[in-house]
Each structure stands twice: as C-alpha cells, then as structure tokens.
Amino acid sequence: MSKTTKRGKGALAAADGKMSRRALLKAGAGTAALLAAARMNFPGGAFAQGAGPEVKGAKLGFIALTDASPLFVAKEKGIFAKYGMPDVEVQKQASWGTTRDNLVLGSEGNGIDGAHILTPMPYLISSGKVTQNNVPTPMYILARLNLNGQCISVGKEYADLKIGLDTAPFKVALEKKKASGKSVKAAMTFPGGTHDLWIRYWLAAGGIDPDKDIETIVVPPAQMVANMKVGTMDAFCVCEPWNLQLIHQNIGYTALTTGELWDKHPEKSFGMRAAYVDKYPKAAKALLMAVMEAQQWCEKMENREETAAICAKRQWINVPVEDVTDRMKGKFDYGTGRVVENSPQQMRFWKDQASYPFQSHDLWFITEDIRWGKYDAGFDAKSIIAKVNREDLWKDAAKDLGVAAADIPASTSRGKETFFDGKVFDPENPAAYLKSLTIKRVEA
C-alpha cells in the first residue's frame, strides 16, 4: 500500500471513531489555527453565529468635514476589511442635497447605502419631507459620529464688534446694513439640518428672526469660505475645516463654537438605508463595529495629528493640513485675539458617550424642526424615532467590541438638556420647551 493510501486511511479513521493520537493532535492544531484566524478577522466574536457578513462591501457617502473622520480612518486603516468588509467604498458627496438624493437611489441605483449625515436628515428622508414627491425612503441611525465641533463664523466687516454668544450687537449692525438697502444673509448647509438649527437657535436667542430679519440660505460646506469672500453672506454655520480656513484667509472670524450653545451636543450620525440593514444585518453590524472602532481611535489625543493629516488628503477633504490640525487637537484661535487651548468644546468621537445615539437627542432635533415649520405641530416624533433610531444595534455591536458595561448607556435618554440662554429641553415634555421659545413658526 502506498504512503498516500496510508495517509488517506489514517485521515478517514475518524469515521470509525478510531483517530490516532497523532492525527487528533494535528486536527486540533489545525482547528486552533482556524479559530485564531477567525478571531483575528472578527474580534469580539462579532459573527460567532454565522460565517461573516452576507456581502463584502457597501457604498458610504461623506461630506468634506472633519466629523467624517471615523469613515476616513476606517477605510485608511483597514478597519472595514478587518471586520470582513474589504470592498467598502467611501465616496465624497458634493452637498447634503446630493447625499439625500444618492441615499434615495441606493447603491443598486448608482447611489449610496449609507452616509456620514446630519442627524435630522434620516428623519427628514424617512418621513419624505425632503424627498422628491415626498416619497419616504426608510433610514436607520446606527451610531452618532461625534459631539460638538461646529462653529458659527462672521465676516470681517464685523471684526470691530467681536461678536460672540450675544447677538445684540450683531442685530444692530444687521439693521443698519438693511436700512442702507443691502441684503443680510446667514448660510447653513441643509434646511432642517444641524447647522441650520444651530444658527437659527443662536440668532433667535438674541432676538433675530432667522426667517424675517435675515435671509437664511443654503451653501455646501466646501463653498462657505469662497462665498464669504465675495460677500454672499454675513454669517455661516458649518463644521471644520472651513471656519479655521476662513481665519487663515483673513476673510472672517469665529463667533462661537456650537458647544458653547449646547455643551456636548450631538452632531453627525452614521446613517444607513433601512433596506440595506434589513437585507444584510451581519454586514451592517460589521460596518457599525468598524466605524465604532475608528471612533475610538480618533478620540485618542495621540492620534489627533494623524487624524488631521488623513482628513487633509486629496481624496477626503483636500485642504492644507494647517486648516485642520489645531482644532482637531483642541486649540481654538477665534481670529479675534481669543485663543482657547484644549477647548472643552472640541470634537468628541467616543468620550462622553459620543457614539451612542440617544433617542432623546433625536427628539430635540425633531422638536426644533417642528419649531421652524419643517414638521406639523402634531407630528408623531416618538413613533418615527422608534423606527429610525437603532440604538439596539449599537448596544449589540458595543458588546461584541468589548465595550465595558459601564460605558453602555442604560437609558435611551440623556435627560434634561440646558442651553446657553437658560432654556431647558425635557424629553418627557417637549411641548413645554416649544412653549418657552419666543421666536418660532409654530403655535405651542
């Protein structure tokens, strides 16, 4: 009998329950190697119940802003591939309107499956409020991408005023400008989005009606600085690097960071088409785990300089790295002589439960969109939040990532939130919050 035949006979002996000790040891070693490889590819037992993601890729959109860093890092550092998703494409979008349109299309229609997105947008898209013919496209929020990190900037024509949280001097200046026959405008990035709500809140708190006293216009983030340069607007709200670039080009200055309006406020989310998540739940979990791991990496201060360098690359934001680095590392030069080192309002990707999508925060965004007429007063916010906000998937992913139980919120609410002007939002009574606001488009 040949050696080959003997080796084959030995391997088949297990069928008779007579595997030799040597064969058993070899088989055990092989199994251990396979398990080790599986753990390396899918740490935390993410796919212990199956063979891994149903598909190897997804198309994810982003806008050229620093709070998309977790997507950049997950791609650059091979984290998507680590979780079995090597074919993920992270695609730049020209505007939030483009992001919306491509989410409606889905990747099967040459669009995208998910995105770095303004937190209110999945609700506006799911409800059909901002889609063509008001046809809803169901969306899920899988994670929050960051807290804080946005700013409101004003043009250098207001340099002497050194405008900050108090808009009283700005109001007087705007009234004088309007009286001279000139238009006054405030720019944001998408109607009903976070930047729209921050600048509206700030203006209204100081008695400036954002619909009557000033014209509120939409400008894509990457076009903010160029538009301010030619005098298109008097103020704008956007994420970095555009506020710092404005200062570097001597076109304007930072009036305030949005964290000064609302400390540790939620900002962007990782949103996915519900159809993708429902069809490919394991792939969606893999994407979520990769993004969460990237958030943890971005949060570490020792990684912030590299995060800034990644952001500055041509395929991502495409700006000089000096427009990114300081604020990514927590240094805020307002362009007025005011400099804050290690700002408490710097962007957070993981610390302070930045990644968990509190449902109470989504309720605030919807309540503000009711305030400004994006939804009717009787809109059923809690019902749509229950459908769109998938904090349950976040918790599941967090457990498989090994996140400590103490770092996984026990409640879907962060409780009452207090704003810079003393207003309090109680998620148990949003109607009372609406009633407390003076300037609004809804009776409450």
Language-model regions: role of each:
Residues 280-392:
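Secondary-structure end/capping motifs
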